[in-house]
Structure formats: C-alpha cells, structure tokens
Amino acid sequence: MFEFTAASQDDFERLVVLRIATMRESLERIGRFDEQRARERFRGSFKPSQTRLIMVDGALAGCVALGPHDAGLLLEHFYIAPAEQGRGLGSAVLLRLLAEAAASGLPVRLGVLRASDAERFYRRHGFVMTGEVEWDIYYEWRPHP
C-alpha cells in the first residue's frame, strides 16, 4: 500500500507545499492561515533525519516526522496529501508507527490544531488528551504492557 523513504534537506520545498495544502482548510476555519508563517514554522522544525516520505506507487503521498523527545517519541509532522485522504492511508501509516513505538515500549506524543480533523483521527487511534493551549491540543498514546 505504501512505503517509507528517507527525507533529505532537498525535500523541504515539496514538503512545505504538502504541509500548506494539508493544513490550509483547518487554519482558514479558525482565521489563522498565513502561508509565510506556515512555511517558517515548518522550516524551524524540519529535521530530515527524523522525517520519512510516504510513497504510494512511487509518488509522494505524505510525510511523517517521528523522533525522540523526553522519555518517548514526538510525532511532529504527519501530513497526507489531500488527494490521498479518506482512503485509509493515514491510519495504515499511523498503525505502523505505533507498532514501532510499542516494540520499543515508548509513548508517542503530539500536538494538533484545535478544531481540526486530526483531533478525531488521533482519538480514534487511542490517543488521549494531555493538555491544551490557545490554538493547540496535546495528545499521548501509550503502548499496552
């Protein structure tokens, strides 16, 4: 269904375009869309060594960044191209990542934009809310013992 390939610094531009396409609707809904800010935030947090491209039939379908953070893992970026959404790809990718985390016995933490579709997606996959601030909600998933 999909395969991961390693990202490089050369992937920055196409991944920031993917980020903007994926988040635009949610950001516009709350009056927070600013293309330049979205680009700058991604530039400040893009770590190619922790980023995997999600490829479907040889084409970029998304990306995910998962790396060590405190005593667990931080899922910092997870974007599925709008044309690929609604087909189970996001769930398949997340389930693979959670299996990797479970094999290591590590929790996975993340933050999502308030009122985005991502909130429901992560709750459906066993994440529980751990905190919130003005625009973001924080979640954690823990492996079963």
Stretches found by the model and what they are:
Residues 80, 86-99, 123-124:
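Conserved acetyl-CoA-binding loop-helix of GNAT-fold acetyltransferases
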Residues 42, 122, 127:
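Conserved active-site tyrosine of GNAT-family acetyltransferases
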Residues 3-17:
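A short beta-loop-alpha structural element at the N-terminal edge
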Residues 72, 101-114:
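Conserved GNAT acetyl-CoA-binding A-motif
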Residues 59-67, 74-79:
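Conserved beta-strand in the GNAT
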Residues 43-53, 62:
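A short helix-loop-beta-strand connector motif used in the catalytic cores of GNAT acetyltransferases and
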Residues 85, 109-120, 132-143:
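Conserved beta-strand-loop-alpha-helix junction that forms the acyl-donor binding cleft
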Residues 17-43:
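Conserved GNAT-fold acetyl-CoA-binding loop/helix
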